[in-house]
Amino acid sequence: MVSKKIIKIAIGLCLFLIAPLTEAQEIDLLLKNGHVIDPKNKINSRMDVAIVDGKIFQVASDIPESNAKKVIDAKGLYVSPGFIDIHTHVFVGSKPGFADGINSMSPDDFTCRSGVTTVVDAGTSGWRNFPLFKDQVIDKSKTRILTFLNIAGWGMSGKLAAENIDDMNPDSAFFTIQKYPETIVGIKIGHYEGKDWTPFDQALAAAEKSNVPLLVECHLPQYPLEDQLNRMRPGDIITHSFEKVSERMSVIDEQGLVRPFVKEAQKKGILFDVGHGGAGFWFSEAMPALKQGLLPNSFGTDLHRFSVNSGMKDMLNVMSKYLNMGMKKEDVILRATWAPAQSIKREDLGHLSQGAVADIAVWSIRKGNFGFIDAGGNKIEGDRKLEAELTLREGKIVWDLNGLAAKKFVE
């Protein structure tokens, strides 16, 4: 016969094991009645979202409010994973230019209000000054900051730094990535004006050795677009995909058709990022491309000091352009969440799976008469515009436009 002592021990052990599960049922924050769009998990319906310890605990219909410490009613609003912007310049500092400079932007000033929870800096730092970038900006920001490491050692520190082939060292870039694998997601080539393909080849070698994607920003006449795409591997990313500048052939030909070699690159698995910026997005390229099936894989904004005050403005504005150009809202959200997460090999991001980090955007579609401007000063008109109502970063509220989470003032 089993002794009473053994039974007591067994019961105590069971209670010990069950206790954490019972405690975990207490919900820190419950988003009720929102329309969830989570492309990875194929959710597109009214759902509740429960958050515990900064992570997604449950996404389901009618989660009881009784165990929730805080409840936010998202009725009439959309709920999605936090948006991911894969082309930004956020190595802000006091120097002229971009690297540690005044032309970069402090990310928290512009991300939260746009529903953006993750940004990827596009080569503003190189292997020489990345540690400064990490200490000065990355580690001190609420926004998650990832990085495409510039093949140039000093990154975007000015023309002389960008032109120094001797400083474009694949081994040094590789060792930097090995040291910071949680932050550096790829290699960047861009802003080189020489006649040699060496920088491109060095960047590609660094990306291959590190098993990361290459972000290509080469709008130079000596780097023909077709040759760039031919050198790129499946999973590599070309940005400023829909620009119309004299320095680089556009993706649309004189007859208004997507060039055949561009279609082949798309079939090969090359990814196309918007990279809007101040000069990287033209309706004359983007609209026929969209109609002919050349869709962007991501809505990189090319966030910097000048683009925020021009036609780009913010990521929501870029997304709104595509919504008004005819892209379905579900496809827009895919390209702002799960698709960019996949492109940078961070599949822990961009979705609301159980256990995932609770980076969340709660947003609305405003109805009205709106104008949208491209890099050439051309305008289209639309009747819908995305607006961020609430942004959560690791389960914490970092933006609340209309006080959804606030207590009502009583006189």
Label each residue range with its predicted role.
Residues 114-120, 124-125, 140-165:
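Metal-cofactor-binding active-site regions of metalloenzymes
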Residues 74-139:
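Metal-associated gating/positioning segment near the N- to mid-region
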Residues 26-30, 36-82:
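Histidine-rich, glycine-flanked metal-binding segment
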Residues 186-309:
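Active-site core of metal-dependent hydrolases
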Residues 284-369:
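His/Asp/Glu-enriched, well-ordered alpha-helical/loop segment
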Residues 34, 357-409:
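C-terminal cap of metal-dependent C-N hydrolases
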Residues 1-11:
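Bacterial N-terminal signal peptides that target proteins for export
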